[in-house]
Design a protein with these regions (language model features):
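Flexible, glycine/charged-enriched surface loops at secondary-structure junctions
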Residues: 20-25, 45-47, 160-163, 236-242, ...
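Short, flexible turn/loop "capping" segments at secondary-structure junctions
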Residues: 7-9, 207-209, 237-242, 328-335, ...
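N-terminal Rossmann-like NAD(P)+-binding subdomain of aldehyde/semialdehyde dehydrogenases
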Residues: 1-95, 123, 264
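ALDH superfamily catalytic-core signature
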Residues: 118, 126, 195-325, 350-352
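Conserved C-terminal structural/oligomerization subdomain of aldehyde/semialdehyde dehydrogenase
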Residues: 19, 28, 307-422
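Terminal low-complexity tails and localization/encapsulation signals of metabolic enzymes
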Residues: 62, 84-88, 92-101, 297, ...
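Structural signal for hydrophobic packing residues in well-ordered secondary-structure cores
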Residues: 12-15, 19-22, 30-41, 50, ...
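Rossmann-like NAD(P) dinucleotide-binding subdomain of oxidoreductase/dehydrogenase enzymes
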Residues: 82-225
Length: 422
């Protein structure tokens, strides 16, 4: 019997015991396990480990992300009924019962080696499942430390430790694929190669959509507010989130003013020569490399040898683009504080441009709009985008990376795994 088979065997034994828990006891387990990362000292340690071992992101932002995303998820799960009868329609006589799926294989990325695993763990436990984490190789140490905290919290409520396990070191593709094949459900967050592997493993699977979020700034927008929100989102955790804006489409009527507002918010617009220097480091034969992924602007400026006089003090960089697709790699996802900027004559042209970009990369995820704060214009344009673009969410007048995956300021549920729909 392989090591993965042994892990699955232990998970099934633990899950069978857990399946008999009442709703009250399940909720106690979820609340206890959430403290594995909500406790400030543990959270700080995990944030520091994540940045140290992966080389990605920012410690303070990961601390905030770990706390906010976990607290929001606990809030969302708190009142959800997941044991026994969950719905009954006396008119049709139909009664719905909640049943666990069994063992969940949770594939997690290096960009969020603490926040994404705990998110998947809590969702699985809420539904009386066991879960096995397949972390990225770089995120293994962070995940292992998280599971030590999780097991301590399971001990406190006398729940089986084997409800939550992870693949052992070294993390290999073969072990991850075996886990996906043997589990009852796969929930995959990570590279598109991992998502494709999840969908073709023969086990029911949920996979995230490819990121490449674009946002429109139209002639009705509060430009200062829009620029500040884009900067907040673009710089958070050095843009590790797939919900971070990768590009902005600015309408002609406000183009120069919007660029000025973005510069005031800390952006630095690079000239063609610096754009080429950035390109030469970021891409290899049109494919994104990891050289600048989730790095600070200062590191990016140094590695790309940027010559702009403000490059060293930038909060984020901007590059102008006119095309899209493989021949315009800046039109794709960059996972770094680099914002691609397009100019469009009007709203309809902006919408059509985004549709073209998403046909290259980003379909199924989300789009942003900065426009009037209320009224027919805002509602009409949001409706237009929702009706015509291949996205799951339209985020209006908000910092995209903060809002898309759930926020205390909007009604969206909290998640670190944005599905791509059908």
């Amino acid at each position: 019997m392989s090591e993965v088979e042994n892990i699955i065997k232990r998970a099934r034994i633990a899950q069978k015991e857990y399946e008999s828990y009442s709703q009250e006891r399940v909720d106690l387990v979820v609340s206890s396990v959430a403290w594995a990362i909500l406790e400030p000292g543990r959270n700080r340690e995990l944030a520091e480990l994540a940045v140290r071992d992966t080389g990605l992101g920012d410690v303070d932002d990961k601390f905030k992300k770990n706390f906010r995303k976990t607290l929001g998820l606990v809030r969302d799960l708190q009142k959800a009924k997941t044991v026994g009868v969950v719905a009954h329609d006396p008119l049709t006589g139909i009664t719905e019962y909640a049943r666990p799926v069994g063992v969940v294989a949770a594939i997690t990325p290096s960009t969020n080696p603490g926040a994404t695993p705990i998110n998947k763990i809590l969702n699985a436990l809420k539904c009386r499942n066991a879960v096995v984490i397949a972390p990225s190789p770089k995120g293994l140490t962070t995940c292992a430390r998280l599971l030590q905290f999780v097991h301590a919290q399971l001990d406190l409520v006398k729940a089986p430790r084997n409800l939550v396990q992870m693949l052992p070191d070294p993390i290999t593709k073969d072990a991850t694929h075996e886990l996906m094949r043997l589990a009852d459900l796969v929930v995959a967050t990570g590279s598109q190669a991992n998502i494709r592997a999840a969908y073709t493993c023969g086990t029911p699977a949920f996979g995230v959509g490819a990121g490449n979020v674009l946002v429109i700034i139209d002639e009705h927008a509060n430009l200062v507010s829009a620029a500040q929100k884009i900067a907040q989102s673009k710089t958070f955790d050095h843009a590790t989130s797939c919900s971070s804006e990768n590009g902005a489409v600015l309408l002609d009527a406000v183009y120069d003013s919007a660029i000025a507002a973005l510069e005031q918010a800390g952006g630095v617009l690079l000239d063609a020569a610096d754009k080429q220097r950035l390109h030469d480091v970021m891409f290899n034969n049109g494919k994104l490399t990891s050289t600048l992924t989730a790095q600070s602007p200062a590191v990016i400026a140094e590695r790309a040898k940027l010559l702009h006089p403000k490059a060293g003090s930038a909060r984020f960089f901007m590059v102008e683009e006119t095309g899209f697709g493989p021949d315009a790699p800046f039109s794709g996802e960059k996972l770094s504080p680099i914002l691609t900027v397009w100019r469009a004559p009007n709203f309809q042209s902006a919408k059509e441009l985004i549709a073209h970009v998403y046909s290259f990369q980003g379909a199924g995820h989300s789009v942003g709009l900065h426009t009037a704060s209320s009224g027919a214009v805002m509602e009409g344009r949001a409706d237009d985008l929702a009706s015509h673009l291949p996205v799951a969410r339209i985020i209006v007048n908000q910092a995209h990376a903060i809002a898309t995956g759930g926020s205390f300021e909007n009604g969206l549920p909290f998640s670190l795994s944005m599905g791509c729909g059908t």
